[in-house]
Design a protein with these regions (language model features):
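Short, flexible, basic/aromatic active-site loop/helix in glycosyltransferases
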Residues: 132-170
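A short, conserved alpha-helix in the catalytic core of glycosyltransferases
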Residues: 164-165, 171-222
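Glycine-rich, basic loop-to-helix element that forms the pyrophosphate-binding segment
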Residues: 61-78, 99
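Active-site-adjacent helix/loop segment of glycosyltransferases
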Residues: 206, 210-287
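Conserved donor NDP-sugar-binding/catalytic core segment of glycosyltransferases
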Residues: 91-128
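N-proximal low-complexity "stem/linker" segments adjacent to membrane-targeting elements
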Residues: 1-25
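A conserved acidic beta->alpha catalytic loop
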Residues: 22, 30, 38-47, 63
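Short aromatic/hydrophobic "clamp" motif used to bind/position activated sugar donors
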Residues: 83
């Protein structure tokens, strides 16, 4: 088997249907299998697959395994020499999988390769490649600033704006679309179970580079990542905080407890500044953004502040 495409589903049945349809329509001349695991969302994906995509191997988990463990379980059921971990809320634009596969085969030093991700409206999803998190780049991390200084090494986004179609070395590939050789995935120790959600892709890309391999961005392989499926359907404070918690765990694992503690302090300080700013500018923001969005922003940054000072804890 040339390729195993592994997809973790969680309340994303409609996205999954479109994702699979695009794979079948655009992926030619490859001997591939598709393995879908539902992480206890029980959204009817299994019935839909049996009815519309009987060639897809389906695994129904009775518990929510989280992204890492669910992918690892599906991996055990796969047989391909190459693996593609793909989000259910993605759709191929042309033969993206073939292009990634060809690139991986042509580059013996490649660890993980990833595609150019677009938002639903066709705009570039700048998070498809990033630098590994540091206190500085996370403290300054704002979409407006990233767009003003896209070539700054701080963000690790230069590859997105490179001329031509040749693969570009990058630090980190988005977990929405990650392709690698099976033996590389095994050598990294698979997805780390240190994270329930978020930073799993960061950790895997870091381990790939630790092996002396190079992660590549393939700009000619284009995939739409709707970003509205799975956990982002309703971005709760839990999900918002888990981004920071997972980054903290990554930094503790690879840069030490002191650095991770510094990250928490910096992020809690930044969150407090945001909360105070939202309150001080509330007369203007309530008019411009509305009560609902203002309250949501206040709630988000207050939760992150509480996390940073140790008043919010999630134990796994």
């Amino acid at each position: 088997m040339d390729l195993s495409i592994i997809i973790v589903n969680w309340k994303s049945k409609e996205y999954l249907r479109n994702c699979l349809a695009s794979i079948l329509a655009e992926t030619k001349e490859l001997n591939y299998e598709i393995v879908v695991i539902d992480s206890a969302s029980f959204d009817g994906a299994g019935e839909m697959l049996a009815r519309e995509f009987p060639q897809v191997q389906f695994i129904q988990s009775q518990e929510n395994l989280g992204f890492s463990k669910a992918n690892n379980v599906a991996f055990q059921a796969s047989t391909g020499e190459v693996l593609l971990f793909l989000n259910p809320d993605t759709e191929l634009v042309g033969p993206a999988i073939n292009q990634l596969y060809t690139t991986l085969r042509e580059l013996p030093n490649a660890g993980i390769v990833g595609a150019r991700l677009l938002n639903t409206d066709g705009s570039l999803q700048t998070s498809c490649v990033q630098a590994f998190p540091t206190i500085l780049n996370q403290l300054l991390n704002a979409e407006a600033l990233r767009r003003l200084t896209p070539g700054a090494r701080l963000w690790g986004m230069r590859a997105l704006f490179a001329l031509g179609q040749k693969p570009e070395p990058v630090e980190m590939i988005s977990g929405a679309c990650m392709m690698m050789r099976r033996e590389v995935f095994e050598r990294t120790g698979q997805f780390s179970l240190d994270y329930f959600m978020y930073a799993e892709d960061t950790d895997l890309c870091f381990k790939s580079r630790q092996l002396g391999l190079v992660n590549y961005y393939v700009g000619g392989a284009v995939i739409v990542h709707h970003g509205g499926g799975s956990s982002q359907q309703a971005r709760s404070n839990f999900a918002n905080v888990m981004v920071f918690e997972s980054n903290s765990r990554f930094l503790k694992k690879w840069r030490g407890a002191s650095y991770s503690f510094g990250y928490r302090i910096a992020m809690s300080g930044a969150a407090l500044v945001r909360v105070v700013t939202l309150i001080l500018l509330s007369p203007v923001l309530l008019v411009l953004k509305g009560v609902g969005r203002w309250r949501s922003a206040c709630s988000k940054w207050l939760a992150i502040f509480r996390w940073g000072i140790g008043l919010w804890r999630w134990v796994r």
